[in-house]
């Protein structure tokens, strides 16, 4: 693994010649590192952070984004999304993320033009190439730059660099759009994502930092890290009671534990496990 200084130098070099940049900034560790590197390369006055606001994101994510931009001294603009107006999103096909990301990036590109930014960049890293990410196609069509990816920096190195730069998000749990909790082919509604978000906040409040609540109709399928499964079993009565209040008739615990992108598991992989696939989504 490269030394942190060398990795950061490669990343800054990817940004050096841009003159100015607008950063698609979720408030997560990847885009936080991207934003900090842009400030190093270009100066805070030549960088603007754009954060999407949508029912598919937890409100806490915007709070984190505001905190990081304040600490870095960067101008911050909130961009409202309109994915629930797009049947290509709400019908929840396998390329759902393409439709969502296309609309969002169009909004951000227009905002970048208003700010006179030379480039729109995001926090996609080298490890993102290995997952099902239709949103990358939307980014490519709009000339969005991926400096972390171009510098060959993956998730583990992102966290290491973020820690060395003392970014408050260096150990933040992985986040993903709440729509990714709904199996492909099942309609996405504001009510469903609100129920998922509220359920995950219940788990966060009980100390489960990395978790997902998958929405299977009236069934909530909970994923926590493998090391936390025993603790989740111990808290099962409280968890079940509080999630039933949110509209879930049945509350289950996935014994495979948390895994990002579990809704993308191929049917043959699920069949090999002896389970029957119930659908898919990203995250």
Segments the model singles out, each with a brief description of its role:
Residues 1-164, 205, 220, 238-248, ...:
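ATP-dependent adenylation/nucleotidyltransferase module used to activate substrates
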Residues 172-192:
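Internal, active-site/partner-interface "lid" segment
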Residues 190-210, 239:
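Short amphipathic alpha-helix segments
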Residues 209-216, 254-255:
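C-terminal boundary motif of the adenylate-forming
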Residues 215-217, 221-233:
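A short interface-forming secondary-structure element
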């Amino acid at each position: 693994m490269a030394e942190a200084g060398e990795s950061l130098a490669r990343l800054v070099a990817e940004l050096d010649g841009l003159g100015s940049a607008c950063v698609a900034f979720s408030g997560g560790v990847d885009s936080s590192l991207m934003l900090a590197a842009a400030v190093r390369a270009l100066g805070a006055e030549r960088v603007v952070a754009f954060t999407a606001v949508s029912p598919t994101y937890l409100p806490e994510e915007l709070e984190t984004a505001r905190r990081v931009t304040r600490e870095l001294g960067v101008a911050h603009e909130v961009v409202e999304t309109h994915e629930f107006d797009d049947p290509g999103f709400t019908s929840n096909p396998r390329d759902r993320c393409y439709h969502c990301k296309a609309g969002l990036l169009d909004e951000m590109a227009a905002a970048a033009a208003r700010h006179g930014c030379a480039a729109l960049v995001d926090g996609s890293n080298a490890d993102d190439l290995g997952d099902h990410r239709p949103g990358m196609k939307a980014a490519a069509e709009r000339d969005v730059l991926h400096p972390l990816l171009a510098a060959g920096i993956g998730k583990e190195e992102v966290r290491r660099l973020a820690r060395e730069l003392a970014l408050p998000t260096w150990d933040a749990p992985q986040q993903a759009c709440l729509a990714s909790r709904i199996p492909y082919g099942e309609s996405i509604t504001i009510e469903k994502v609100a129920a998922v978000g509220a359920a995950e906040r219940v788990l966060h409040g009980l100390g489960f930092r990395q978790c997902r609540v998958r929405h299977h109709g009236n069934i909530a399928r909970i994923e926590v890290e493998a090391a936390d499964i025993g603790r989740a079993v111990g808290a099962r009565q409280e968890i079940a009671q509080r999630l039933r209040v949110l509209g879930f008739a049945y509350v289950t615990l996935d014994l495979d534990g948390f895994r990002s992108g579990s809704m993308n598991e191929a049917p043959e992989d699920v069949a090999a496990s002896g389970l029957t696939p119930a659908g898919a989504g990203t995250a």
